[in-house]
Each structure stands twice: as structure tokens, then as C-alpha cells.
Amino acid sequence: MSADKKQNLQDTFLNAVRKSRTPLTVFLVNGVKLQGVVTWFDNFCILLRGDGRPPQLVYKHAISTIAPSAPVQLFDEEMGGD
């Protein structure tokens, strides 16, 4: 894969959970726990939607940990994760 086509792990992970609509638990650096599905992201923030509440725009620098509710396949089997 050429250098200009390489995606970083963060973008690969967020794109995979966005496409599969995998529910996430997001822990912020101040201890707040958010739950929802990623509907959009860019270099600085993530849009998180949850059941029955308006979407939340979360800045990435405020995130400590992201825990998906199910395993996430990041790479194709034939790629081998390289």
C-alpha cells in the first residue's frame, strides 16, 4: 500500500464502527461515560448518537477510552493487518 493511501489506525477503527453501527462506550478524561453510535468523525471530533437523545459532538482530545460492544474487524483477512 502506498504512503498516500495508508490510513491511520484511529481512522480505520472509527470508520469500521461507523459503517457497522457498532454501539460504543466512550470514556472521557474527566470520567464521564457516553454511549452511542458514531455517525461522523473528522480529525478533531466525533459525532455520537444515542437512543432518545440529541447527537453529541465530542472532541477527540477529551476522550480517554473507546470500548466497542462487539469485536471490530479492522483489516481484511488477506491484508494481514499490515
From Swiss-Prot:
Per UniProt, subunit arrangement is: Homohexamer.
Quote the protein name from its UniProt record: RNA-binding protein Hfq
- Give a short account of what the protein does: RNA chaperone that binds small regulatory RNA (sRNAs) and mRNAs to facilitate mRNA translational regulation in response to envelope stress, environmental stress and changes in metabolite concentrations. Also binds with high specificity to tRNAs.
State the taxonomy lineage: Bacteria, Pseudomonadati, Pseudomonadota, Alphaproteobacteria, Hyphomonadales
Give the protein family.
Belongs to the Hfq family.
Q: Which domain of life is it from?
A: Bacteria
**What are the record's GO terms for cellular component?**
cytosol
Residue ranges of every copy of the Sm domain listed in the record: 11-72
| Entry-linked InterPro entries | Hfq, LSM_dom_sf, Sm
PROSITE patterns, alphabetically?
SM
Q: Which organism is it from?
A: Hyphomonas neptunium (strain ATCC 15444)
Its GO biological process terms? regulation of DNA-templated transcription; regulation of RNA stability; regulation of translation, ncRNA-mediated
Q: One MF term in GO for this entry?
A: RNA binding
Q: Which UniProt keywords apply?
A: RNA-binding, Stress response
Question: What NCBIfam families does the annotation carry?
Answer: Hfq, PRK00395.1
